[in-house]
Swiss-Prot record:
GO biological process: protein quality control for misfolded or incompletely synthesized proteins; rescue of stalled ribosome
Protein's name in the database: Peptidyl-tRNA hydrolase
Site (Stabilizes the basic form of H active site to accept a proton): D96
Binding sites annotated in the UniProt record for tRNA: Y18, F69, N71, N117
Gene for this chain: pth
Subcellular location(s) of the protein: Cytoplasm
Domain of life according to the entry: Bacteria
Record's function text: Hydrolyzes ribosome-free peptidyl-tRNAs (with 1 or more amino acids incorporated), which drop off the ribosome during protein synthesis, or as a result of ribosome stalling. Catalyzes the release of premature peptidyl moieties from peptidyl-tRNA molecules trapped in stalled 50S ribosomal subunits, and thus maintains levels of free tRNAs and 50S ribosomes.
Family named by the database record: Belongs to the PTH family.
Catalytic activity: an N-acyl-L-alpha-aminoacyl-tRNA + H2O = an N-acyl-L-amino acid + a tRNA + H(+)
GO cellular component, one term: cytoplasm
Organism: Marinobacter nauticus (strain ATCC 700491 / DSM 11845 / VT8)
Keywords: Cytoplasm, Hydrolase, RNA-binding, tRNA-binding
């Protein structure tokens, strides 16, 4: 049976300055998925990022964390998609989401970029917004002037625990989401409640 999701991309910024920051939630998810499958992401120049191919839960998935900066993510995503002839609708892009509380996640198909530079560049390079998104909640600082410092700030202990819990839940629903049962996966994931 054809897979609905063939490629999972984690948006983030490269380098130790950005490790474990809220803005790197997507990249942290893809690292966790690779670990779950017993694989390690390795540098791959032709895809401008860290790459692994995994066989997991009956799925054959290409994992990519672009090593470009966030606002150039589309370069890496397009390079990998073009090489393996993966269509945009078969791509799941995991990214941090200010408009969701920490420890929650939502699956979404299509839509705008909502001011997220990684999504903006992905849409520009793919020439469409018709790809799937995994929105990982990081919360909002409450003041739009504080957003940059907030997203580039490091995750606290409780936030890390909440992200780990939601990553586990995403991994439970991903096989359904990738194999034609997106509605069921969304229902389960969207009803997941973070630990207080």
């Amino acid at each position: 049976m054809a897979q609905d999701i063939v490629m999972v991309v984690g948006l983030g910024n490269p380098g130790s300055d950005y490790e474990n920051t809220r803005h790197n939630a997507g990249a942290l998810f893809v690292e966790a998925l690779a670990r779950e499958a017993g694989q390690t992401l390795r540098p791959e120049k032709k895809y401008h990022g860290l790459y692994a191919r995994i066989q997991w839960q009956g799925l054959d998935l290409h994992l990519l964390n672009p090593s470009t900066f966030m606002n150039r993510s589309g370069t890496a995503i397009k390079a990998l998609a073009d090489f393996f002839k993966i269509s945009p609708e078969q791509i799941l892009v995991a990214h941090d989401e200010l408009d969701l509380p920490p420890g929650t996640a939502k699956l979404k198909k299509g839509g705008g970029h909502g001011g997220h530079n990684g999504l903006r560049d992905t849409i520009a390079h793919l020439g469409t917004n018709d790809f799937q998104r995994l929105r990982l909640g990081i919360g909002h600082p409450g003041d739009s002037r504080k957003v940059t410092g907030f997203v580039l700030g490091r995750l606290g202990k409780q936030e890390t625990e909440q992200l780990t819990a939601v990553f586990d839940e995403v991994m439970r629903v991903l096989p359904d989401a990738a194999s034609g049962k997106l509605a069921a996966a969304m229902n389960r994931l969207h009803s997941f409640k973070p630990t207080p």
